[in-house]
Design a protein with these regions (language model features):
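DNA replication sliding-clamp ring fold and its partner-interaction surfaces
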Residues: 57-60, 64-71, 178-182
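N-terminal low-complexity, Pro/Thr/Ser-rich intrinsically disordered segments
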Residues: 29-54
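Solvent-exposed loop/turn segments at secondary-structure junctions
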Residues: 78-82, 104-108, 130-133, 145, ...
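Primarily the HKD phosphodiesterase
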Residues: 63, 67-124
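N-terminal signal peptide c-region/cleavage motif recognized by signal peptidases
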Residues: 23-25
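Structural recognition of the beta-strand scaffold that forms the well-ordered cores
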Residues: 48-50, 73-76, 99-103, 126-127, ...
Length: 197
């Protein structure tokens, strides 16, 4: 049954206007980053992959850190893996610029966190508390150089990720465009992160 005074063409017009209004209103409240489509990159370089618990992902990561010449940038949700922490500390001691952005809540609530130990050994540590979880697991080694390396995957830098969980880690070399995208994201988080203690 039609409402009095509204013809079908008026109803269609009003429905169309409402649809346009709702669509443009939603776009107005959408963060600008959502409007930018994710980039598509050409595959290049090499990729090493490790799966846990069957493979030594911690060694793969530590070996990559051992090869760092100038810089290691890290984003970590949780950090309890001693071998990886030791590799970062050793890199710092040999003059490599090492910066870690960690999730504040995880750092404060996990008694076995190695963040304080790394900070006490000269690693520059920053806390990211701008998100429900700072859940990135990323390392950028020598970004901007020919040997730039990106490490990422589900693998938290933890003992549990190595010995208890089913995880994966990718070590990618020779894809500067991909490293640059991750570096841009790392810098976005670094801008709002706060120094540890």
């Amino acid at each position: 049954m039609m409402s009095p005074g509204c013809s079908p063409s008026v109803k269609q017009y009003m429905a169309g206007c409402l649809a346009v209004f709702l669509t443009t209103s939603a776009a107005a409240f959408e963060p600008p980053s959502y409007r930018k489509p994710p980039p598509v990159l050409s595959a290049s370089g090499t990729v090493q992959v490790a799966f846990t618990p069957g493979q030594d992902a911690g060694k793969l990561i530590a070996d990559a850190i051992d090869g760092a010449r100038t810089q290691v940038l890290v984003q970590a949700f949780s950090f309890t893996h001693r071998r990886i922490a030791d590799a970062l500390i050793a890199a710092r001691h040999r003059g490599v610029d090492v910066k870690v952005i960690a999730d504040r809540e995880q750092t404060e609530k996990i008694p076995t966190s190695l963040i304080a130990r790394m900070a006490s050994q000269g690693v520059l540590v920053f806390m990211d508390s701008n998100h429900s979880s700072a859940h990135n697991k990323v390392m950028l080694i020598d970004a901007g150089s020919a040997q730039a390396t990106l490490i990422t995957g589900s693998f938290n830098f933890t003992h549990a990720a190595q010995h208890k969980n089913a995880e994966n880690v990718l070590v990618m070399r020779g894809n500067s465009a991909l490293v640059d995208l991750y570096l841009e994201n790392w810098l976005d988080h670094f801008r709002h992160a706060r120094p540890y203690r």
